[in-house]
């Protein structure tokens, strides 16, 4: 769970000003505003972006409570919000008539009605009238008896529905929620059901509404269109809450009458109150108007409370995983849970289990198909996910379709392969906040391997590093996407810390110039764990830079006691490797940098040495020339003093090469310093020799 940010009054004022000026969502359109706001408030970009998302959700909640449309969405028709919310903490005596003590479900949805024309007849005994698309609006009428639950569907067009689908689940609840991120003309199936506690069967009707989540309460048997059912008070289950004036519409989903069977159903939240048997004399409280005033994903009506609870639920997902097994028997699908024993058919208490199918493609129809759910796989198409939860914790159940059991999309008739990982349902089901992703916990050796490949040029997510990414993924036995995620996180870490990302290198990894990997294998666990103190950011990719700075500041505090213990033990000549902190990878990187610098300095020194040698050689040559000239001048002076003409002629005929090249005809009257010094020195030497 990420750290909570505490803003000052000035920061709150700046954030609110930017929000009022258009910084209302987290899309690319508001990127520049979020960036400017982050610079002005001196906050991290991700912190401001998170604040925008929280602010947007709170405003949506307030608007939903007041009956207004959610801000920030562009719809052709005004939004109408359906709010069906249960307080988990509410005692059983205060629960509404459609809830039970141990079966609390948060049901929300935002529906955009299409244009409706002629209004048709209503049912006098119904609480809700479900009508066909573009024909009849939904209308909530007064009823004589609140305990009667009737659903009526006038048939104007062939509508996809399901029949003869019985559910043998005495203690199960259904939530089928759907969200679409792109508003289009697609419809989803909206099933409202009423549970019959006498024979564990439920009759329901079917309605399709556009755009947003489809919700189905209770294990249900979908009956053909046009049939009315009435239930006695002793079989009273959930009451359907709809706002007056809502006009969700029905659309022809291009299919024939087929069987839609929901074989296994679960609920999300659990309360600690004991179960109570709903009978004919069970106290039932009619739904109050308060239930219609709460908004999306709200249990208490307090946005601050709900955000705290949402984070608390998100933090629970990694603590106690629960496992579910599914198997198929006959025409129904039963569920067995390791933590729950299925009751006998005589018990009618709903368990707290849930299957949440969201993001299904438009007009997803199950046509005459049975689904075999096998353990340890997860189900989601490109835009659909199935969740299972027990004791509101994340479950590792794994539904998987057999080869012939596939989702049939009625519009394009495409089959989707089912695969993928689960996300957290209480985050993704009802919130626009980004889902918490599965985190990969690398071992110390895996991190050393990844950073070894990073140092070898695996620093890009593009195709240039594809071979290295595949090689390290094979070596670590992980998916390539996990390696790419690690690379992206490390690149972001480098950018935040102001470090230039090394350029990528193509081709396979070459470790010939790097230390042998065997040296890493010889390290003790104490040595190996050393470098990971400062590597928290590699694993915590969603934590802001403040946390990474904190972790780097904590690192010296952990090193000091180790060094102190090491110095104490050095006095006793008993130093253990566990108390020595060795930065293996960082030292290797620093060594590589220092080696390159040393090579540059060495090459520069070699050049200077060659230059010095050349100068020394030149100096030696000049010395030899000087001695020759000195000898010649000495001999010539002696010949001139002795007035020996023959000796003078012999010396002049055999001049040194340097003197032969000189032009004596244009000789300067004033001798240069060198010749003067040489001649004076020669005369001095001659006088001394004499």
Swiss-Prot record:
<feature type="compositionally biased region" description="Low complexity">
    <location>
        <begin position="64"/>
        <end position="76"/>
    </location>
</feature>
<feature type="cross-link" description="Glycyl lysine isopeptide (Lys-Gly) (interchain with G-Cter in SUMO2)">
    <location>
        <position position="221"/>
    </location>
</feature>
<feature type="region of interest" description="Disordered">
    <location>
        <begin position="112"/>
        <end position="132"/>
    </location>
</feature>
<dbReference type="GO" id="GO:0000785">
    <property type="term" value="C:chromatin"/>
</dbReference>
<keyword id="KW-0371">Homeobox</keyword>
<feature type="cross-link" description="Glycyl lysine isopeptide (Lys-Gly) (interchain with G-Cter in SUMO2)">
    <location>
        <position position="163"/>
    </location>
</feature>
<feature type="cross-link" description="Glycyl lysine isopeptide (Lys-Gly) (interchain with G-Cter in SUMO2)">
    <location>
        <position position="232"/>
    </location>
</feature>
<feature type="cross-link" description="Glycyl lysine isopeptide (Lys-Gly) (interchain with G-Cter in SUMO2)">
    <location>
        <position position="172"/>
    </location>
</feature>
<keyword id="KW-0677">Repeat</keyword>
<feature type="DNA-binding region" description="Homeobox 1">
    <location>
        <begin position="3"/>
        <end position="63"/>
    </location>
</feature>
<feature type="cross-link" description="Glycyl lysine isopeptide (Lys-Gly) (interchain with G-Cter in SUMO2)">
    <location>
        <position position="140"/>
    </location>
</feature>
<dbReference type="InterPro" id="IPR050255">
    <property type="entry name" value="POU_domain_TF"/>
</dbReference>
<feature type="cross-link" description="Glycyl lysine isopeptide (Lys-Gly) (interchain with G-Cter in SUMO2)">
    <location>
        <position position="212"/>
    </location>
</feature>
<protein>
    <recommendedName>
        <fullName>Highly divergent homeobox</fullName>
    </recommendedName>
</protein>
<feature type="region of interest" description="Disordered">
    <location>
        <begin position="55"/>
        <end position="76"/>
    </location>
</feature>
<feature type="cross-link" description="Glycyl lysine isopeptide (Lys-Gly) (interchain with G-Cter in SUMO2)">
    <location>
        <position position="613"/>
    </location>
</feature>
<dbReference type="GO" id="GO:0005634">
    <property type="term" value="C:nucleus"/>
</dbReference>
<keyword id="KW-0539">Nucleus</keyword>
<feature type="cross-link" description="Glycyl lysine isopeptide (Lys-Gly) (interchain with G-Cter in SUMO2)">
    <location>
        <position position="144"/>
    </location>
</feature>
<dbReference type="InterPro" id="IPR001356">
    <property type="entry name" value="HD"/>
</dbReference>
<feature type="compositionally biased region" description="Polar residues">
    <location>
        <begin position="113"/>
        <end position="123"/>
    </location>
</feature>
<keyword id="KW-0238">DNA-binding</keyword>
<dbReference type="GO" id="GO:0000978">
    <property type="term" value="F:RNA polymerase II cis-regulatory region sequence-specific DNA binding"/>
</dbReference>
<feature type="compositionally biased region" description="Polar residues">
    <location>
        <begin position="674"/>
        <end position="690"/>
    </location>
</feature>
<feature type="cross-link" description="Glycyl lysine isopeptide (Lys-Gly) (interchain with G-Cter in SUMO2)">
    <location>
        <position position="194"/>
    </location>
</feature>
<dbReference type="GO" id="GO:0000981">
    <property type="term" value="F:DNA-binding transcription factor activity, RNA polymerase II-specific"/>
</dbReference>
<keyword id="KW-0832">Ubl conjugation</keyword>
<feature type="region of interest" description="Disordered">
    <location>
        <begin position="664"/>
        <end position="690"/>
    </location>
</feature>
<keyword id="KW-1017">Isopeptide bond</keyword>
<dbReference type="InterPro" id="IPR009057">
    <property type="entry name" value="Homeodomain-like_sf"/>
</dbReference>
<feature type="DNA-binding region" description="Homeobox 2">
    <location>
        <begin position="435"/>
        <end position="498"/>
    </location>
</feature>
<feature type="cross-link" description="Glycyl lysine isopeptide (Lys-Gly) (interchain with G-Cter in SUMO2)">
    <location>
        <position position="135"/>
    </location>
</feature>
<dbReference type="GO" id="GO:0006357">
    <property type="term" value="P:regulation of transcription by RNA polymerase II"/>
</dbReference>
<feature type="region of interest" description="Disordered">
    <location>
        <begin position="501"/>
        <end position="539"/>
    </location>
</feature>
């Amino acid at each position: 769970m990420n750290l909570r940010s505490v803003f000052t009054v000035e920061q709150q004022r700046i954030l609110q000003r930017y929000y009022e000026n258009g910084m209302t969502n987290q899309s690319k359109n508001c990127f520049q505003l979020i960036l400017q706001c982050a610079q002005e408030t001196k906050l991290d970009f991700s912190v401001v972006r998170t604040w925008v998302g929280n602010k947007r959700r709170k405003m949506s909640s307030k608007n939903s409570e007041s009956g207004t449309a959610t801000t920030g969405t562009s719809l052709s028709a005004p939004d109408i919000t359906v709010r069906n919310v249960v307080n988990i903490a509410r005692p059983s005596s205060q629960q509404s008539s459609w809830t039970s003590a141990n079966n609390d479900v948060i049901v929300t949805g935002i529906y955009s009605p299409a244009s409706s024309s002629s209004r048709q007849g209503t049912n006098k005994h119904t609480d809700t009238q479900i009508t066909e698309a573009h024909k009849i609006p939904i209308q909530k009428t007064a009823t004589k008896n609140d305990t009667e639950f009737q659903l009526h569907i006038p048939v104007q067009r062939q509508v996809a529905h399901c029949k003869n689908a019985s559910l043998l689940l005495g203690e199960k609840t259904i939530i089928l929620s759907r969200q679409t991120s792109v508003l289009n003309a697609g419809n989803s199936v909206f099933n409202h059901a009423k549970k019959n506690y006498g024979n564990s069967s439920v009759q329901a009707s079917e309605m399709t509404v556009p755009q947003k989540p489809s919700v189905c309460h209770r294990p249900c048997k979908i009956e053909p269109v046009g049939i009315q059912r009435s239930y006695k008070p002793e079989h009273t289950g959930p009451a359907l809450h709809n706002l007056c004036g809502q006009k969700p519409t029905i659309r022809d989903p291009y299919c024939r009458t087929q069987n839609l069977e929901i074989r296994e159903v679960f609920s999300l939240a659990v309360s600690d109150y004991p179960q109570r048997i709903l009978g004919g004399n069970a106290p039932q409280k009619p739904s109050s108007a308060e239930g219609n005033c709460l908004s999306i994903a709200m249990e208490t009506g307090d946005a601050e409370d709900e955000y705290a609870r949402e984070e608390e639920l998100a933090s629970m997902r990694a603590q106690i995983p629960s496992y579910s097994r599914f198997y198929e028997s006959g025409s129904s699908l039963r569920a067995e849970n390791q933590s729950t024993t299925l009751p006998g058919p005589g018990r009618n208490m709903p368990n707290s289990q849930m299957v949440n199918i969201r993001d299904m493609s438009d007009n997803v129809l199950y046509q005459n198909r049975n689904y075999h759910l096998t353990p340890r796989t997860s189900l989601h198409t490109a835009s659909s996910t199935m969740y299972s939860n027990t004791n509101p914790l994340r479950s590792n159940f794994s539904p998987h379709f057999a080869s012939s059991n596939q989702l049939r999309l009625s519009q394009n008739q495409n089959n989707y392969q089912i695969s993928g990982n689960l996300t957290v349902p209480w985050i993704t089901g009802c919130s626009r906040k980004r889902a918490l992703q599965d985190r990969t916990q690398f071992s110390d050796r895996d991190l050393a391997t990844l950073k070894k490949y990073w140092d070898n040029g695996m620093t890009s997510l593009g195709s240039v590093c594809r071979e290295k990414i595949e090689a390290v993924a094979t070596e670590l036995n992980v998916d390539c996407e996990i390696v790419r995620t690690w690379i992206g996180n490390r690149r972001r870490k480098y950018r935040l810390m102001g470090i230039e990302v090394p350029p990528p290198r193509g081709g396979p990894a070459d470790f010939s110039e790097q230390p042998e990997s065997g040296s890493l294998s010889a390290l003790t666990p104490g040595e190996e764990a050393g470098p990971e103190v400062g590597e928290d950011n590699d694993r915590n990719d969603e934590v802001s830079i403040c946390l990474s700075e904190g972790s780097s500041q904590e690192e010296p505090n952990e090193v000091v006691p180790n060094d102190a213990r090491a110095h104490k033990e050095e006095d006793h000549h008993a130093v253990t490797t566990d108390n020595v902190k060795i930065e293996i990878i960082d030292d290797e990187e620093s060594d590589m940098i220092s080696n390159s610098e040393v090579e540059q300095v060495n090459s520069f020194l070699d050049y200077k040495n060659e230059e010095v040698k050349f100068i020394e050689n030149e100096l030696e040559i000049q010395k030899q020339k000087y001695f020759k000239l000195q000898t010649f001048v000495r001999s010539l002076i002696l010949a001139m003093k002795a007035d020996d003409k023959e000796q003078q002629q012999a010396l002049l005929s055999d001049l040194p090469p340097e003197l032969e090249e000189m032009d004596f005809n244009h000789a300067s009257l004033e001798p240069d310093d060198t010749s003067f010094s040489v001649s004076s020195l020669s005369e001095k030497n001659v006088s001394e020799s004499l």
